[in-house]
């Protein structure tokens, strides 16, 4: 799939994924998300998912995630700019207005957008604002289709996995009501625990007090963060990497819906990824069904060396 820059906005270019001479697929449902979902390029292309990139600034330079670099390239930029905290910008209501027109013009009849945690970005609210005004401002599109917006309630594979499943459903010919019912049910039930190996970025972003980060690094203390119900909190603290992985596996296995699929999120460390996957497999009796390598949204606040488990919670958890 070739990336085509379709429009130029005030401060940056917004790429829209199109194919030259694109032929509309059998499904007229368009599944859209943003780059904080950390969906792999392979799944993006296989299931016809449209992923909107976030603009990112490091120092005095601006980039577009997934366009100017992949995840490894972003980690390298972080290493090259150790004193700069990457900053992400929102996707604007104007951009969503243009996006909706493009999708309807392409022949799609139902647009489903799943956004990054709405407490972490104004992107969700901008998508809703554009939707609420769209058919009034563009009456020529009235009756052409529907637009539905979902809060991803988290980051990375926490909503990236449900987006992939929704795209699979669309490819299988499921009706839009079935897909939206699935998303409405699953998104609030997704939880993630992830361990942070270096506290510098968490301190810079304000997730952890600077003094606590200095002491924690000196003592080898590794925090386990929980993302749940739009909130990010420090859930546990462990001393040493082995205890960190064991604790995450214990807690995740205890809280997840028995027999349900789970995923591993990770950054630059494949060894820790594989060790955590092995511990989870031992705990629950089956392997993770997907892996999500974190991009700018999580790495900017936690650093590139993180690893975690994302799962669907059981009712009482």
Residue ranges, per PLM feature:
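Hydrophobic residues in alpha-helical segments
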Residues: 78-79, 104, 170, 203
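Mixed-charge interfacial surface used for oligomerization/domain docking
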Residues: 23-30, 36-44, 49-50, 55, ...
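N-terminal glycine-rich anion-binding loop in soluble enzyme alpha/beta folds
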Residues: 30-95
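Short, Lys/Arg-enriched N-terminal segments with co-localized hydrophobic residues
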Residues: 9-25
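Glycine-rich phosphate- or other oxyanion-binding loops that anchor nucleotides, phosphorylated ligands
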Residues: 82-84, 90-132, 176, 180, ...
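Short N-terminal leader segment in a subset of presequences, especially plant chloroplast
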Residues: 8-12, 34-37
